[in-house]
Regions:
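ATP/NTP phosphate-donor binding region
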Residues: 1-70
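Long, hydrophobic/aromatic-enriched structural stretches that serve as scaffold segments
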Residues: 70-91
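Conserved anion/nucleotide-ligand pocket segment
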Residues: 126-213
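Short, acidic/small-residue loops that bind anionic groups at enzyme active sites
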Residues: 90-122, 126-134
């Protein structure tokens, strides 16, 4: 069971901005209500400009979280578009491989965090492509979305996810994140479940998932050329 959670900003530094303070407070309280101890790593709240200009600090936070024996879960604050810049500080001297040696910590996040998942996959760490702190735990609508909450609770209580089934609801994206949106639910619509595009409805094998835009960048290489 998870007890201690480290929040890291490996992509964008939005979480450290004053305009996101009300969301941070909501998320921190929700985690505390689960009985979790939340630790924001030293640079997690450094803000957009610092995080943008100092990928070495982002990498240092990730390494410190893995090295800390008290941390059970590493939760990414939010995605972004440049976490690839951490690579030299994680791989040049084998820093990441050394830091994760023997670890069974949960690593959780999505979007640009796909890159971090692949980095950790490279050094043999199993990760969970799922909730981020700001986007999901800090949801303004009064509570975490039910589908999100269901799997988050399973993960912190059991350390794993046994099976993923479709949500019966989809939600329109929130466009206003100001304090006045606190308690305002997202417009919801019925969902029809998985859609089979081709092939057999039953198949087995290993799969690497993630953000399709980020995965495309791995092969295209043109975005930051």
């Amino acid at each position: 069971m998870v007890k201690n959670v480290a929040v890291v900003s490996l992509s964008a530094g939005v979480l450290g901005e004053s305009f996101a303070k009300h969301e941070l407070d909501i998320g921190a309280k929700r985690l505390a209500d689960y009985g979790l101890n939340v630790r924001f790593m030293p640079h997690a709240l450094a803000g957009i400009e610092h995080i943008k200009n100092h990928p070495e600090d982002r990498a240092a936070d990730l390494l410190a979280a893995f090295r800390d024996p008290e941390i059970d879960m590493i939760l990414c604050a939010i995605g972004g578009d440049d976490t690839y810049r951490l690579a030299p500080y994680l791989f040049e001297y084998g820093e990441l491989e050394t830091a994760v040696s023997g670890t069974d910590k949960i690593f959780l996040g999505f979007s640009d965090t796909t890159v971090n998942h692949m980095m950790l996959h490279k050094v043999g760490v199993k990760t969970f492509y799922g909730q981020s702190f700001l986007s999901d735990v800090c949801e303004l609508g009064g509570e975490m979305l039910p589908y999100t909450r269901r799997y988050f609770e399973e993960l912190i209580q059991t350390g794993t996810i046994r099976a993923v089934t479709p949500s019966d609801t989809w939600y329109e994206a929130r466009t206003d994140f100001s304090p006045k949106q606190a308690g305002v639910p997202l417009p919801a619509h019925p969902d029809t479940g998985f859609e089979l595009l081709q092939g057999s409805p039953r198949f087995s094998g290993k799969i690497l998932g993630g953000c399709i835009d980020t995965l495309f960048d791995f092969f295209d290489g043109g975005r930051y050329a």
